[in-house]
């Protein structure tokens, strides 16, 4: 792992922890009302990507995402940023077709050869899922950021939404949480190299395989977990008819993230998430403040949160384990609406 460039030292916040908080974002875009009957999925429902119908059998899925460095290795940072951007297409159940680079380059602190490695890392992930890089746009910036604009394709009848989970379905999370806390620890030089490598491997792994595998089953909803944390994105999956009942002990997380959170190594994005969800979620008394921070932790390139039948979920998890994707767990269930959108027990 190449740490000589110290990419994380020249940014205020790492990765998706730099994301604008969900409350502020909603206020900012609420007046934007695109009107076109071919828009199958817009930004009015907090979906992962937008979908625009081309004809009876084809729709394009569009998204973009870019992040500041979460690790110091340029190539791995490029991989993580690309995996994070591509994930929105996978969450919709779509296939990636093309991508374009989005770059803000900090020429003052970062050498040009590091940028070449970042772009190579990103391109490796685009190729891994069968996509093609078509170009991009680069500006000079006081802070480094990199990501992708991504276009995918899907049949209009096969779109997987995030806010349609069925009562009786269970919730599967495919990656452990805690990455916001751990990338903050990286930025503060608190993490040992072996743990940095483990975190980087998790963040750089694509959600492509879980996305392809879940399509074999009856999936009622799916989203990916990124800057708003598990709780923020789970809230986007709720509606007036259902409540998500989640067991905090069943949520996979990286152990060291708990330890760092206990020592107040908590990113600002995570604190904003905690503030946003506090009146929307019931945390039962057995859920500690440290677990609350973990559940709200701002993830970068997190896993998929999928609602599906319990028997299917068990088979799905076993399939992922067979492909060495061993973090997936059933973390809760969808129940009829109670007094809160989410209950954490």
UniProtKB/Swiss-Prot annotation:
- CDD domains noted in UniProt: SelD
Give any GO molecular function from the UniProt entry.
Answer: magnesium ion binding
- From the UniProt record, list the reaction(s) this protein catalyses: hydrogenselenide + ATP + H2O = selenophosphate + AMP + phosphate + 2 H(+)
| Binding residue positions for ATP | 19, 45-47, 65, 88, 136-138
| Marked site: Important for catalytic activity | 19
Enzyme Commission number(s) from the entry? 2.7.9.3
Q: How is the cofactor bound?
A: Binds 1 Mg(2+) ion per monomer.
Q: Which Gene3D superfamilies match?
A: PurM-like C-terminal domain, PurM-like, N-terminal domain
Tell me the active site. Answer: 16
Q: Which GO terms describe its cellular component?
A: cytoplasm
Q: Which residues bind Mg(2+)?
A: 48, 88, 224
Name the InterPro entries on file: PurM-like_C_dom, PurM-like_C_sf, PurM-like_N, PurM-like_N_sf, SelD_I, SPS/SelD
Entry function: Synthesizes selenophosphate from selenide and ATP.
Q: How does it assemble?
A: Homodimer.
Q: Which family does it belong to?
A: Belongs to the selenophosphate synthase 1 family. Class I subfamily.
Question: What protein name applies here?
Answer: Selenide, water dikinase
Q: Which organism is it from?
A: Aliarcobacter butzleri (strain RM4018) (Arcobacter butzleri)
Highest classification ranks of the organism:
Bacteria, Pseudomonadati, Campylobacterota, Epsilonproteobacteria, Campylobacterales
Q: Which gene encodes it?
A: selD
């Amino acid at each position: 792992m190449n740490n000589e460039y110290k990419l994380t030292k020249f940014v205020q916040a790492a990765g998706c922890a730099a994301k604008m908080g969900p409350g502020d974002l909603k206020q900012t875009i609420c007046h934007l009302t695109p009107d076109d009957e071919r828009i199958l999925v817009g930004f009015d429902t907090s979906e992962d990507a937008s979908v625009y119908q081309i004809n009876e059998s084809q729709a394009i899925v569009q998204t973009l995402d870019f992040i500041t460095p979460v690790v110091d290795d340029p190539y791995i940072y490029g991989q993580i940023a690309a995996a994070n951007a591509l994930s929105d297409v996978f969450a919709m159940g779509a296939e990636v077709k093309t991508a374009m680079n989005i770059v803000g380059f900090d020429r003052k602190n970062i050498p040009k050869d590091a940028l070449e490695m970042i772009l190579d890392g990103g391109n490796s992930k685009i190729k891994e899922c069968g996509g093609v890089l078509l170009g991009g746009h680069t500006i000079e910036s006081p802070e480094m950021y990199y990501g992708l604009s991504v276009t995918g394709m899907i049949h209009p009848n096969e779109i997987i939404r995030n806010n349609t989970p069925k009562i009786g379905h269970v919730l599967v999370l495919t990656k452990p949480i805690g990455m916001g806390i751990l990338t903050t620890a990286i930025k503060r030089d608190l993490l040992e190299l072996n743990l940095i490598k483990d975190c980087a491997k998790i963040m750089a792994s694509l959600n492509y395989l879980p996305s392809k595998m879940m399509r074999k089953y009856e999936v009622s909803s799916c989203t990916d977990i990124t800057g708003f944390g598990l709780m923020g994105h789970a809230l986007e999956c709720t509606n007036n008819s259902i409540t998500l009942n989640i067991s905090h002990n069943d949520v996979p997380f990286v152990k060291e993230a708990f330890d760092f959170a206990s020592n107040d190594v908590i990113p600002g994005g995570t604190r904003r998430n905690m503030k946003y969800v506090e009146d929307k979620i019931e945390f039962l008394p057995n859920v500690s403040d440290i677990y609350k921070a973990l559940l709200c932790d701002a993830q970068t390139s997190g896993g998929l949160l999928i609602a599906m039948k319990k028997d299917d979920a068990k088979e799905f998890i076993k399939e992922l384990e067979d492909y060495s994707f061993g973090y997936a767990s059933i973390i809760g269930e969808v129940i009829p609406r109670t007094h809160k959108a989410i209950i954490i027990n």
